[in-house]
Regions:
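Extreme N-terminal leader/targeting segments of oxidoreductases
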Residues: 1-32, 419
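Helix-loop-beta segment of a Rossmann-like dinucleotide-binding subdomain
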Residues: 92, 119-129, 161-198, 202, ...
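C-terminal catalytic lobe of FAD-dependent flavoproteins
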Residues: 325-422
Length: 422
């Protein structure tokens, strides 16, 4: 089956995923309601359940149905706009603080997959960024040296070293690369379904329902859904591209951006690492799954307004056609790849390329996270821990301060096109 009942294309991850986590009836009340079955929501429910909270995770479709189940499957530490640009905006201390959240999240993924026995094709094979043209080589390798001096696991690769990682000849335009040996790859839907199942084992309740409104009510919040209302002392909103539906004060500050992806029919193992490149200004990325399929996305540069502000999750022929040209251009012997399916998903971006994570403005007792700029995979696990700490202690952890909704660099998105950050 290549599409859902409403005609929305199914991703490779969804098509090869286990059955959805079963849904329970909505309770009348609980300690915490978590809204959204993506990275933030599922991990927050997991950590709260482990801490002994009575937690209900509400998702309108299924766990990993949004961005997570439509992405490239990378668990990569780092910052969407890079360290240098982020440090200019918020200072080096703040930039390293956010970087550490992503590194800690990556470590949590490895740890919990092992502890909970999650079968999700986890491979800590690293990711490599391709450098196109000799002019870029010195610039990129200089940034590698800066990060390495701060203890980041990163390596500069010349063309010969890069060729050792990739089992097909490189095109002449590839000059070298940047290798991140500690980054990992997963089957996105299997991975998050496994976290959700683990959360249930620890006592979390999963309910399929569509939340329509949050109402402050004394010392708690009424979570209004189409299926009923739940009273909770605390609420966590983790719906990323749809954040403004429940937290209106973030309208225009967190905006949806469509990402388009395709998968190829299986071929013999060629790419063991994740791969990123900037053939277009908005960037491309891919991994080869264990069954030999290649999942590749990017090329937003070919879409009107770079797909910023788009809420439809249907791919467009122009962008998919451009994506299909990327690998054959860079690896000439792979010019016979056959497209198996294509799909789209919604990311969420902010003007300063940093997520929002902390108290929701205008909603006492509500916490919110969103705007991950295509990098939610490493942030979700650690933010779930930090939200659990905030709810159990009643105070905001210092680690969340650079991501607060009232930071001066979080301005309305007007014309930013978010280049090369997928």
């Amino acid at each position: 089956m290549t599409s859902t009942s409403n005609g929305e294309p199914r991703s490779y991850w969804h098509a090869t995923a286990p059955p959805p986590v079963p849904s329970a009836a909505l309770p009348d009340a609980c300690d915490v309601v978590v809204i959204g079955g993506g990275q933030v929501g599922t991990w927050t429910a997991y950590w709260l359940a482990r801490a002994g909270a009575d937690v209900t995770l509400i998702e309108r479709t299924a766990i990993s149905w949004g961005a997570t189940g439509r992405n490239g499957g990378f668990v990569s530490a780092g910052l969407a706009d890079g360290f240098t640009a982020t440090a200019v905006r918020i200072g080096e201390e703040g930039a390293w603080g956010v970087w550490r959240i992503s590194e800690q999240g990556r470590e949590i993924v490895q740890q919990i997959i092992a502890e909970e026995g999650i079968d999700c094709d986890y491979r800590e094979n690293g990711t490599v960024g391709l450098i196109l043209g000799e002019d870029e080589l010195d610039v990129k390798h200089a940034s590698v040296n800066e990060l390495a001096s701060h203890g980041v696991a990163i390596e500069a690769l010349d063309r010969a070293s890069l060729q050792e990682l990739i089992r097909t000849p490189l095109a002449d335009e590839i000059a070298g690369g940047v290798f991140h040996p500690q980054n990992a790859l997963v089957h996105s839907a299997k991975y998050l379904a496994g976290v959700g199942a683990a959360a249930q084992r620890h006592g979390a309740r999963f309910c399929q329902a569509n939340v329509t409104e949050l109402q402050s009510d004394g010392d708690g919040t009424l979570v209004v859904t189409e299926q009923g209302t739940v009273r909770a002392r605390n609420v966590v909103v983790g719906i990323n591209a749809w954040t403004d539906e429940l937290v209106p004060e973030l309208t225009g500050l967190i905006v949806p951006v469509r990402g388009q992806i395709l998968s190829y029919e299986p071929i013999p193992t060629t790419f063991t690492t994740g791969v990123g490149v900037a053939v277009t200004p908005t960037g491309e990325y891919w991994q080869q799954a264990l069954d030999g399929s290649i999942v590749i996305g990017g090329c937003r540069d070919d879409a009107p307004n770079k797909d910023v502000g788009v809420r439809e999750t249907v791919p467009t022929p122009d962008v998919i056609s451009r994506i299909a040209d990327v690998i054959p251009r860079l690896f000439p012997q792979l010019n016979g790849l056959k497209v198996a399916r294509s799909w789209a998903g919604l990311m969420a971006f902010t003007a300063d390329y940093l997520p929002v994570a902390g108290p929701a403005p205008g909603l006492p007792g509500v916490w919110v996270a969103g705007g991950f700029c295509g990098h939610g995979m490493p942030f979700g696990p650690r933010l779930g821990q930090l939200f659990t700490e905030a709810i159990t202690t009643g105070s905001t952890p210092d680690a969340l301060r650079p991501l607060s909704a009232d930071r001066p660099t979080l301005t309305p998105v007007v014309s930013t096109v978010f280049e090369a950050v997928e």
